[in-house]
């Protein structure tokens, strides 16, 4: 095929060479030479050089066709002229069309490819809408709480920005690095950051300039320039708003936390319905025992439900046996000293994880971790020491602990303090007797299983616990004997038959259901349970006691002991639990009958329910303080305050000023003394009066009888709450300062505006002076004795001293009649004159007695004169208002009492506002806090809520709870069967 094409090409070439085609040129016409054509073919006979074959096909070339691949230079081969055809426009058009098609095709293909790539990237991006809940709610609320316009106005200009941020480049670099970390895939964060224009202060220099350009920061006329101080103030204001917002959120959370804590503390009292969890059989039984333990301690009784009581001499290995059964070193250990100071109830149950927890705590201790084991031992030791009262060594309070783990036998064991024979130094004198009484209290339960622990490494004759056990269970129907430290016994005891006698029950004077021999370690407290088990198994495998058949295989190892104790425990439970349930059912019936007969119309409210009822009543009574009318508050405050300060006003201000000779001196003296009184004593006295008034009103609402509905069972509680609330309440410290200014301004005012105020001041002055005159008359009557009417009517005579004072009074009255403008004090010559006159009549008088009598006589005379002056001043308001100078009618004392009266009214009004607006609410808050504290203190509730009714309701609640839980346990026990 290639040869055919080449031959055809040669024919075409020859035809072209011999044709008359030519090119029109400006030069003379030349003939094209055949050799000058640059057309070569590989198959031409005259070809000398091998060139790349020209791939052509049979087609006629023209000026409109596509140009050949290689340019050929055509020369004229014949002489003469040929027509020149210029096709440069066609060539240019074809090239332009080629570029257009290329661009158009590239654009279409590139657009399609870009769209496909964008769709692929969009599909690869995760959908972040599902994760919006991760972002806090306040992030979405930023736009509501941040005023962007105000922040934009507060932002500095470009020039000021450089001054405010000298380290602009470093901040920009840090922000760029942060943006590089969070930019891929985190559009949500960028939106939150972009919500605040404060980014202008944090962006890079390039970004800042770019944003300033976009937002028009190049123009200084767009924003008003403000000073640096105003900018700082605006930013601080925004910061304070944000702080206040989060402070309110924090306070709300604290309040909710406190309410939730209170609900948790009262979950049993208010009957909060919680999701019922299916409990295991042993957990249900342990819960019953916990309730019974509290019931027994409260009423000095002992239930008869089965439990395994672990008793033994001190350091006999009780705790070690219990730890081997629980498969964890959970108890604090000591070398020979007493470590078990109170009974510890351990509830063993099977579970997937080896954990321990206390009855009153939700924390779980992982017994596979050494740090949790150490924390558990420390917690048990702390609880033991806290349960021991001052001056004692052991405690009767039971510590309840639950242990769950794989392979544990279900049972309830109680580890008791070890029995001692001698009280050592540091122990309480009654320690031995207390331990015996605790052990007897647990062992005298006819359904209790006694696990008697005996140290095999000591002589049997030194045992104390065996005698005690034989006394409590002489037939041995519920006793299991355990011999510990058999490895030491085998080494130390010369006769192995002695161990055999112990295990067979022939050596000790006691009987038992079964006898076991165990090894609980080598005496090293750091040994693990696994190593102790391995040592125990290895010892008994190699022991001569087993090889010589002195011990049987089922009598050794703690595993066999645990199985035997568990079987005995559940056998005892099944035999006795229904009988105990019937006993509590009978007790419940008796208590309910007693309640119906004694309190037929009252609900059975226990102590906690009564406390809640009393709490609501107390809070209602506190709310009643806000219902007191303002008029009542002001009347009480004004009356009480005047009773407190009237003596000071009369004795220290009015009387000394009234002794002056003219009105100017009177007013000056009054102003000075009022100023001193206001600066030092008056505000403090006013606050004291207000606080006492609040106490009196609070006490009145707390103690007033409510008629038939009043329940005196709450009286002690209400009194305690009232006293504690008043003790905690303190008046606002700034009240005195504000009162001082108000009182000073009130006393400075002297202008009485109308006749009504004038008459009110006169009435106020008359009442005050009449009261003082009455008191003075009473004092004088006591000094001089009864007058002639009382002496004749009531047959009362005067004493010798009263006769002397009566004569002295008569002489002094004569002196006043002679000089009605006499000064307040007697001169020495006047005292001598009075004494001489009395001596002339045979009456010897002491000068001090004369002066004392003169004080009361002159006081009565002055008060009567002042009252007469009040009557004269009733018509003096016109002179006062017109500022007439009339020496016969100067009513400065009326103005003084008007100032005092006005000060009292303004002070009472101010104190009333403080009471109703602030102090009553603060007192209510204190009452709530006191009630919450009392609610958490059970001892306080027991002390304040007492009586037969309360005790009977408590008994009913406990017995019902015990019976219900026992019935639920019995039902679960039958289902397990």
From Swiss-Prot:
User: E.C. number, please?
Assistant: 3.6.5.5
Residues in the Mitochondrial matrix compartment per record: 87-95
Show the coiled coil region(s).
224-271, 911-977
This protein's record includes keyword Mitochondrion: yes
Transit peptide, start-end: 1-86
Region annotation (G4 motif) maps to 484-487
* Domain Dynamin-type G residues, every copy: 302-578
The residues that the entry says bind Mg(2+) are: 319, 340, 415
Q: Which domain of life is it from?
A: Eukaryota
Intramembrane residue segments, as ranges: 788-798
Which pairs of Cys residues are joined through disulfide bonds in the record? 873-891
In residue numbers, the region (G2 motif) covers: 338-341
Where is the region G5 motif?
518-521
- Keywords associated with the record: Apoptosis, Coiled coil, Disulfide bond, GTP-binding, Hydrolase, Lipid-binding, Magnesium, Membrane, Metal-binding, Mitochondrion, Mitochondrion inner membrane, Nucleotide-binding, Transit peptide, Transmembrane, Transmembrane helix
Q: Which residues bind GTP?
A: 315, 317-320, 334, 485, 487, 520
The UniProt similarity line reads: Belongs to the TRAFAC class dynamin-like GTPase superfamily. Dynamin/Fzo/YdjA family.
Written domain comment of the UniProt record: The paddle region plays a major role in driving mitochondrial inner membrane fusion. It binds lipid membranes enriched in negatively charged phospholipids, such as cardiolipin, and promotes membrane tubulation. A conserved intramembrane region, named membrane insertion loop (MIL), within the paddle region inserts deeply into the bilayer, further stabilizing the interactions with cardiolipin-enriched membranes. OPA1 dimerization through the paddle domain promotes the helical assembly of a flexible OPA1 lattice on the membrane, driving mitochondrial fusion in cells.
User: What quaternary arrangement does the UniProt entry report?
Assistant: Oligomeric complex consisting of membrane-bound and soluble forms of OPA1.
Entry protein name: Dynamin-like GTPase OPA1, mitochondrial
